[in-house]
Amino acid sequence: MKKDKICLVSSSGGHLKEMLQLKRFYSKQDYYFVTLARMDGKSLAKNEKTYFVKCPARNPIKFIINIFQSLKILLKEKPTIIISTGADTALATCYLGKLLGKKIIYIESFCRPTKPSITGKMVYPIADLFIYQWKELAKYYPKGKFGGSIF
């Protein structure tokens, strides 16, 4: 049986920390990271296959750069699954991945107990599996799955 290739995409900081806490779920697969070239991302790159993209940060030029960087990585790596814990850094990878026929798994951040994140709201319509960690979010994500505290 062929292993899935997994793209793990997240912003740096807490989003990346949450992704790393999921390692038991992806460690036996072929995987790589897409994140920001900040201190934690650079540290990750010492031991893991890691690509860096521009942070869109509500800047149209940086977002366009992020789109091209994300597309280049997706075409090179050809993942079968994209898993994201947010935030804006992951948006282009998720949408481009969906257009390329990849499965999208989005995990809403644990720090969002009452209201959905902007990225969560944007990725929800295209996610094959959308996991939220607080029951209060069920009304925002009716097709999502309650995962409880998974980190």
Regions from the PLM with identified roles:
Residues K5, T80-I81:
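Structural motif
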Residues L8-L20:
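A short, glycine/small-residue-rich beta-strand->loop->alpha-helix junction that serves as a flexible
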Residues S10-S12, K28-N66, E136, G147:
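Conserved nucleotide-sugar phosphate-binding/catalytic loop shared by glycosyltransferases and other
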Residues K17-R24, A92-Y95:
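Histidine-anchored nucleotide/phosphate-binding helix
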Residues R58-T80, L99:
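An amphipathic, basic-hydrophobic alpha-helix
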Residues I81-L100:
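An aromatic- and histidine-rich active-site surface loop
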Residues K102-F151:
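Active-site-proximal region of nucleotide-activated glycan assembly enzymes
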